[in-house]
């Protein structure tokens, strides 16, 4: 069943945030970061480079010519041979600009309106289209006329996703092995303390000629203890099983 499109205006002035309730149905965490789209045009005697940067679930902060805390930032540079690039235009949609979300089964649009740019107000629309087979996660420029900016991206992140699927898609960062690692470390430490401490105790009691002999004796005792564990466990199981069977017999 196809859901009707919903248009929801953000009530709080926040950055493009993966935790926003309007984005909960999607998995933008999987494409979190700053994405860029660049066009290069020959404008003799120079070239004009226009780069649009979009911060998904994090503001733009590391790009030199972009204002801090921008969600979207466009930088136009004039390139001339043997000369440093000259920045001619910077268009910024700040993180505190109010946004609107237009969502559907086919994806979601994030809409920015009324960003100040010189004497005019400019608008932007990020159109994320659901494509379960897409691996590129790259923006394309649909429109920029000096007033309205439209960028689109075909991505799996824009497909409606359950919480269970989000957990499955998260990359293993090694945390799942943390407990096993710590248990192994503590076990090694415990055995080391047991063996060395036991050897030191035997040596101090005078039961061994030297510390090395005491250490060897403790290790041998420990090995014998390990060998006896299976039979000890078997005996415990047989006792419980035997009691259970006798109990059933008595009940009959």
From Swiss-Prot:
InterPro entries: Autophagy-rel_prot_27, Man6P_isomerase_rcpt-bd_dom_sf, MRH_dom. It comes from Candida albicans (strain SC5314 / ATCC MYA-2876) (Yeast). This is Autophagy-related protein 27. Belongs to the ATG27 family. It is a single-pass type I membrane protein; Single-pass membrane protein. PANTHER family: AUTOPHAGY-RELATED PROTEIN 27, MANNOSE-6-PHOSPHATE RECEPTOR FAMILY MEMBER. It comes from the Eukaryota. Keywords: Autophagy, Cytoplasmic vesicle, Disulfide bond, Glycoprotein, Golgi apparatus, Membrane, Mitochondrion, Protein transport, Signal, Transmembrane, Transmembrane helix, Transport. Glycans are attached at residue 49.
């Amino acid at each position: 069943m196809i859901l009707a499109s919903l248009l929801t205006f953000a009530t709080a002035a926040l950055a493009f945030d993966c935790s926003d309730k309007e984005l909960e149905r999607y998995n933008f965490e999987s494409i979190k970061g700053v994405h860029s789209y660049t066009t290069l045009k020959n404008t003799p005697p120079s070239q004009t480079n226009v780069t649009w940067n979009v911060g998904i679930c994090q503001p733009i902060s590391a790009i030199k010519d972009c204002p801090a805390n921008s969600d979207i930032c466009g930088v136009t540079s004039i390139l001339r041979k043997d000369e440093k690039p000259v920045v001619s235009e910077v268009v910024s949609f700040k993180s505190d600009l109010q946004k609107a979300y237009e969502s559907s089964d086919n994806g979601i649009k994030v809409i920015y309106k009324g960003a100040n740019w010189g004497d005019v107000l400019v608008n932007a629309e990020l159109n994320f289209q659901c494509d379960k087979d897409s691996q590129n996660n790259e923006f394309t420029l649909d429109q920029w006329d000096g007033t309205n900016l439209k960028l689109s991206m075909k991505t799996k992140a824009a497909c409606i996703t359950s919480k269970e699927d989000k957990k499955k898609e998260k990359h293993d960062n090694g945390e799942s092995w943390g407990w096993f690692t710590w248990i192994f470390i503590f076990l090694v430490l415990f055995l080391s303390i047991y063996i060395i401490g036991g050897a030191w105790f035997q040596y101090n009691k005078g039961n061994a000629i030297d510390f090395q002999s005491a250490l060897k004796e403790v290790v041998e005792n420990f090995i014998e203890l390990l060998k006896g564990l299976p039979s000890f466990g078997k005996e415990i199981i047989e006792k419980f099983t035997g009691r259970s069977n006798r109990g059933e017999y008595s009940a009959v």
